[in-house]
């Protein structure tokens, strides 16, 4: 019952690893040095990309629930929250947990 969410999470981790494979520095290259301002800009840019990606997750949750009737909505919600936990601060997740649960439950009941 929990195998599909775990499989989806594993696939997303593997894809991220494959995309970054082979991008290490060679011996002749020097590591770039970022100032604190650049690091904060990079962090905000990455958070923006993650937010854009996570906006599509509820649609994926609905699609999975339509395809597989064995998966309970709570399993889908816990998978989505795990994805959020990986991407954001735990404090931000705790604040938005109720909103996320209500939104996904509403979307699942409308299907």
Curated annotation (Swiss-Prot):
Signal peptide from the UniProt entry: 1-24
Gene Ontology BP annotations: negative regulation of male mating behavior
Expressed in which tissues: Expressed in acinar cells of the lacrimal gland from where it is secreted into tears. Not detected in a range of other tissues tested including other exocrine glands, internal organs and sensory epithelia.
CDD domains: ESP
Compartments it resides in: Secreted
Pfam families: ESP (PF16590)
GO molecular function annotation: pheromone activity
One GO cellular component, as annotated: extracellular space
InterPro entries reported in the protein's UniProt record: Esp1/Esp22 (IPR032253)
Keywords (A to Z) from UniProt: Behavior, Pheromone, Secreted, Signal
Domain of life: Eukaryota
Function: Pheromone produced by juveniles which activates a small number of vomeronasal organ sensory neurons and exhibits a powerful inhibitory effect on adult male mating behavior.
Family from the record: Belongs to the exocrine gland-secreted peptide family.
Name listed for the protein in its UniProt record: Exocrine gland-secreted peptide 22
